[in-house]
Amino acid sequence: MANPFLMDEDLDGCDAAANPFLMQSEPEPSSDNPFMAATVASNPFAFGADDLELGAEPEAEATHDNDLDPAMSFFGTTIEAEDDTLSLKSGAEEEDEGKKPPQSQPQLQSHAHPHPPPPRPLVPPQSTQDLISTVSSQLDETSSELLGRIPATRSPSPVSMRDLHSPSPTPDSGLADLLDVSVDSGSSAHTQGIEADLISGVAGGVRLDNPFAVPTAVPNIQAAVPLPATPIKQPPRPPPPRPAPPRPAPPGQAAPQRPPPPLAAVNPPPAAPEADDLLDMFGTTACKPAKPPPPKSKEDILSLFEQPHVPLSQPASKPDLLHDDLDETIGEGEPPEQEEPDTEQSNEISSRDEPVFTSLLIRPDESTHDITSQPQAATGLERQVNNMAAPSGTASTQRATTPDIEITTVEDLPRSDDEDEPEAMQEPETETKPQIEPDTEPEIVSEHSPPTERLVTQAALVDGELIAAEPEPEEMDTGLDFPLASSGQLSANPFASPDEEEPNFAPMPAAVANIFAVNDPDSQMETPKAPSHTANIFASDPDEFDAFSAKFDSVKKDNISIMDGFGGSGAITPTGGDAWGGSAFGSTTISANACGDTNSADDGFGNDDDDFYAMQAPARADSVESVDKDFSVVIRPMAEETSGVAPQLAPPPPPARGVNQAQTTSLPGLTVNPFEDVSGFPAPGLPPTDGTAIKRTDSQDTPQTPLYDEDVSQPLEEFPRLHYIGPGWEMQLRQPNKKKITGQRFWKKIVVRLVVQNDVPVVQLLNQAGDKQPFQELPLQPSYSVSEIGAQQYDQFGKIFTMKLQYIFYKERPGVRPGQVTKAERITNKLTKFAQYAIAGDYEGVKEFGSDLKKLGLPVEHAPQSSQLFKIGSMNYEDMKQFSVCIEEALFKIPALRERALTYKMEEVQVTAVDEITVEQDFEGKILKQIARVRLFFLAFLTGMPTIELGVNDMWRQGKEVVGRHDIIPVATEEWIRLEAVEFHSVVNQKEYERTRTIKFQPPDANYIELLRFRVRPPKNRELPLQLKATWCVSGNKVELRADILVPGFTSRKLGQIPCEDVSVRFPIPECWIYLFRVEKHFRYGSVKSAHRRTGKIKGIERILGAVDTLQESLIEVTSGQAKYEHHHRAIVWRCPRLPKEGQGAYTTHQLVCRMALTSYDQIPSELAPYAFVEFTMPATQVSHTTVRSVSVQDSDGDEPPEKYVRYLARHEYKVGIETTHGESTNAYLAATRPIREEPPTTATKPTASPVAPSDSDTDSN
């Protein structure tokens, strides 16, 4: 008859009254069916609403109370507002609700407690019965649906229908946790109400009708006497915002998955006895609190949700089987008088317990059936239910507080036990076992909940809970199934750390006498004796609890919530210790810490009762507590070995359950922790302290190679071409210098020298190398620069390399240069708005645009203007490179000063970082040498006389940068490099750099200067961005040059693919073969160009030709770019604008094949070109990983920070060996020209023999 959903009229009056689902406003004489009995359309779900608020609704409610037994309140869960939400209210119910003023929980509780078990409820009117049927069906359906909705991250633990319907604090807390809504009001209210009840009399006449209800704040049994800690009576919190419970579908729709059998129906008459027995199960058979009459009206129900009043000591009400007051459980063994003193506590506990367990999502039929069907279980559960019923008044009061909890939705109830049961509370076995094995669970739970609960619950549960355990599993009470007192928290969340969850109400724990320790009144008394709020409800052995508490006190300080699924602070905090982020029961008053805090003793989770609680709650992945904490608190009150906090392991350690199992061996199921699933809830493990942790590489965005070579044992090798020692270079000067008529210009052979006169480098042009006086001298200035090396037609045979020495100056002019976007973007945006204004006819908008345009002005670019000083040319490429480097070295050393303050319309700063690397490889690809340096160029257009501070990623500056937000240059990576052999331009304050490693300088105006340069050591094992393999193959009269280029493509994971640009590969060709590549044109000789062939593909006319005859092999074929003979290089040059090509991925290969068919008269040099030369650039400082991190402009006269642009470039030069192979057939020329090895050695070794006359030979060549 524990099933409040049972609608039989056979239920005892008391039991019937216990059915909280009875919503009828009119008491029904035939109150056999607790659901039918609704005298005043009282909400059958309001537990003891009548009892609680008999005064308020003496008439209707009294009748209803009589009609509804505490057992009648469904699982001790007075569902008023929430029940209404869950179930379609009957018109009568609504009327009653409207008619009857909502009674305060306290009132309801007080009424509930004082009233003896209410007489059987009258048979509820047909409307009530229909309503009950609908509600039960809806609840069942809703629970299943909600369970299905539970996020995968939460182990889907079926929520008992009881929990769904129970407004008990447990659901409240759970809801808050699930919803992440602070249940302070609700939890507090529940807790307070429970607190009051518990404190007022733990053994108060009112037992927790709902054994499953976990008092949100279950006072410690020890604190049976009202504890001052309870003082924190928080007004009942309004129900936390909970998703509107799915409206119960019409009875037809909601196929009653489990038709709620009337509680009385299951075992109507025995309801009270069974309740007693159940209470006896907990060891408190001696005295049973009178069950508060079920709330008769919605007001009652609502009042149930209101903050519970500290119930006056009430006569033991008929224990609600479903509710099975924890109080009764605890105090039943105690004499009723005990209950009276503890009435407040017991009431409070009862209410707490009731609400908590009531809110359990126990499926009414299953849990009820289980409880009712099994006499023992029914007895224990009944006692609990009756207690819950009595507390149902209390619970009702608490329920009033409980409004936070939305009974309707499983989601609302974030119960750990609910979670424990992956599905409907049908798995009560585990939970029931927890009740029986609370000890075991408490261990596991104890991590989360105080051991006290475990002790009392264990005793009580072992007696009755084994029996009730089976029914309870259905309940899946989050903490409701667990002794409310145990956690001392109505909605203590097994996962919630009591401290974190909510302010623990120390007094409450006292009241939290172990509800389940009915058999252990003394224990309860002991707990009360321990005024500490952490008094263990179950702590028959205070010493154990103390050790336990001490063990977890330290843990709790850190964050019990991490693993404290049950020790959630009584309050429901969004981030509660609850597995869902809040204490499962949301018992604010009960601060029983899972670690055994004063309030933890009040662990209201009924850890022992619910294997879910017994189980260690896995840390939520998203829980800050779980993630941040290095350990999980595992409370094992019964375990002697648990002398300290158990380290948080990946999954909650099964051993904890094992301990509880040992304690509650009778419930093997309890040992199974549904949350133990490591895959589901891996608890954060301790960070590796043995150095095995993954070490961060120097660069998170680059391949797993160091940014630089750590080996500095060898001195840096000098960068090539820096120091030139020689007479000068033979070059040609383009004359006249200024272009007039092309036909009049010519090349004049000269000699160029670079000398220093008065500390100023001077370029001298001489007619002859022996001349003493140059015919022209050109002192270099900082604004001079050399151009890139080019080539132009020299004569009919080929081209000449050219280079200009030029003077560069800049002008501000309207326009937008590539890369300049800021002002242009602003104007573009304005234009867009202008178009909108114009279309809309918004004259004001058009005027505004004109005003803005006038303010902004046209985009301005600083366009470089170059004036050519002279152009020189040479047929030798290396000479041109050397001359260019020498000029740049001279310019770098020229002092540059900012002579005057200028004014710019737009201030701009440009920084260019250039990597230069030279690599030598043998034909096998082995790197013989790589030398790299970095150069930073700076160009500024700034108003006034500002000072610049440039920040680069120098490892010495890591962590010491202090710059304004406008000065920061966005960077894609955090990389810090080592600078070696740093050289500065004269403008840099070198003393400041030596002191602080900061680069400060006053930039010259509009001068593109090389600000600094430094060396880096590229790592030896770094993969080159472009790899060439070239081979000469000589076979007979055929020579084949084959080259393969591999482009890894990805040099940076974060920056993405960085291509190689302007790739040129030179394969020197012997002069004797040059004619093969020459083609006569009108006025000059041209070169044979390559055919672009994709491997294995033939297109164009070649398709037709291929069908008739084999394709003629082209002299040069390439798969990418173009290759041709370039006479000025005396080489076949393969050029590709970009590798890999657009759209290609990493590790692409590109091929060149040059087939030369030689005649027998063609010479074959004894040695073909040993090296190929590769040059290319990359748009990033791929070699050094240099980054410009900030550009700070100080003492600027500008109104706004200057626009800043940073460009990165890497220049690569490779010298790669070419392998030479010979085919089987011997080349005729080579064979003919092979040196004849006469036999001097052979003849010398021959033994001298007497000459034989050739007389016997017919043919004598002599």
UniProtKB/Swiss-Prot annotation:
List where Polar residues composition bias occurs. 128-145, 384-401
Q: Which InterPro entries match?
A: Adaptor_comp_med_subunit, AP2_Mu_C_sf, MHD, SHD_dom, Stonin
Compartment annotation:
Cytoplasm; Synapse
Q: Assembly and partners? A: Interacts with the second C2 domain of Syt.
Disordered: annotated segments: 17-36, 49-189, 225-452, 474-507, 643-709, 1226-1262
Which GO MF terms are attached to this record?
clathrin adaptor activity; scaffold protein binding
What other note does the entry give for this protein? Answer: StnA, which is involved in the same pathway, is derived from the same bicistronic transcript that encodes these two different proteins.
One Pfam family name is Adap_comp_sub
Highest taxon of source:
Eukaryota
Output this protein's name.
Answer: Protein stoned-B
Sequence motif NPF 4, location on chain: 43-45
Name a biological process GO annotation: synaptic vesicle transport
Pro residues bias spans: 115-124, 233-272
Q: Which residues form the SHD domain?
A: 728-902
Q: GO CC: one term?
A: AP-2 adaptor complex
